[in-house]
Curated annotation (Swiss-Prot):
<dbReference type="InterPro" id="IPR050217">
    <property type="entry name" value="Peroxiredoxin"/>
</dbReference>
<dbReference type="InterPro" id="IPR022915">
    <property type="entry name" value="Peroxiredoxin_TDXH"/>
</dbReference>
<dbReference type="InterPro" id="IPR019479">
    <property type="entry name" value="Peroxiredoxin_C"/>
</dbReference>
<dbReference type="InterPro" id="IPR024706">
    <property type="entry name" value="Peroxiredoxin_AhpC-typ"/>
</dbReference>
<dbReference type="GO" id="GO:0042744">
    <property type="term" value="P:hydrogen peroxide catabolic process"/>
</dbReference>
<feature type="disulfide bond" description="Alternate">
    <location>
        <begin position="198"/>
        <end position="204"/>
    </location>
</feature>
<feature type="domain" description="Thioredoxin">
    <location>
        <begin position="2"/>
        <end position="156"/>
    </location>
</feature>
<dbReference type="GO" id="GO:0045454">
    <property type="term" value="P:cell redox homeostasis"/>
</dbReference>
<dbReference type="GO" id="GO:0005829">
    <property type="term" value="C:cytosol"/>
</dbReference>
<feature type="active site" description="Cysteine sulfenic acid (-SOH) intermediate">
    <location>
        <position position="44"/>
    </location>
</feature>
<keyword id="KW-0049">Antioxidant</keyword>
<comment type="similarity">
    <text>Belongs to the peroxiredoxin family. Prx6 subfamily.</text>
</comment>
<dbReference type="InterPro" id="IPR013766">
    <property type="entry name" value="Thioredoxin_domain"/>
</dbReference>
<keyword id="KW-0560">Oxidoreductase</keyword>
<keyword id="KW-0676">Redox-active center</keyword>
<keyword id="KW-0963">Cytoplasm</keyword>
<keyword id="KW-1015">Disulfide bond</keyword>
């Protein structure tokens, strides 16, 4: 099972948009792969609507989205049609129809429910490296804005070589500022308070950019 920091496994998948090769399909872009337990289920339906709502925002962040479950393509298609007809939402992102091979590779099959994928999220960067993995129980839907926040934060982290605080960009202590990496030697530590806004030499912040 791949972990954070690992290369996303190479795989050929069948989706509602046709065959794809991951992670090459999204080379140079961020992508989010999320698994859902099954089509035509209540919580998963609310999640698909919520993911579609933020899909344009994700694409503006140069991030793609792909769903996955152990269901056949025709099931995905009928469910997507149902969502469009009954919930007035056109699902625009691809959904992987998995026979179980992809789910096994990514560690998405729960032993107690071998026919259902767990509710998981993989965040993959433009180099194909897994940057975050989230798991949710079957009865709890995902917080979609948090997933978007992660993409925004990772882009800033990578571009500026900083860290993002809790609840960024609305942190209780430093607002939308970011955290400067701690000093790694005594001389740098001594200079820190003159260079940045600091609570102490090991907790210094700066404004964006």
């Amino acid at each position: 099972m791949p972990l954070i920091g690992d290369k996303f496994p190479e795989m050929e998948v069948q989706t509602t948009h046709g065959p794809m090769e991951l992670p090459d399909e999204f080379e140079g872009k961020w992508f989010i792969l999320f698994s859902h337990p099954a089509d035509f289920t209540p919580v998963c339906t609310t999640e698909f609507v919520a993911f579609q709502e933020v899909y344009p925002e994700l694409r503006e962040l140069d991030c793609e989205l792909v769903g996955l479950s152990v269901d056949q393509v025709f099931s995905h298609i009928k469910w997507i049609e149902w969502i469009a007809e009954n919930l007035d939402t056109e699902i625009e992102f691809p959904v992987i129809a998995d026979t179980g091979r992809v789910a096994d590779t990514l560690g998405l099959i729960h032993p107690a429910r071998p026919t259902n994928t767990v509710r998981a999220v993989f965040v993959v960067d433009p180099e194909g490296i897994i940057r975050a993995i989230l798991y949710y129980p079957q009865e709890l839907g995902r917080n979609i804005p948090e997933i978007v926040r992660m993409i925004r934060a990772f882009r800033v982290i990578d571009a500026e070589g900083v860290a993002a605080p809790a609840n960024w960009p609305d942190n209780q202590l430093i607002g939308d500022h970011v955290i400067v990496p701690p000093a790694s030697d005594i001389e740098t530590a001594r200079k820190r308070k003159d260079e940045y806004e600091c609570y102490d030499w090991w907790l210094c912040t700066q404004s964006r950019g």
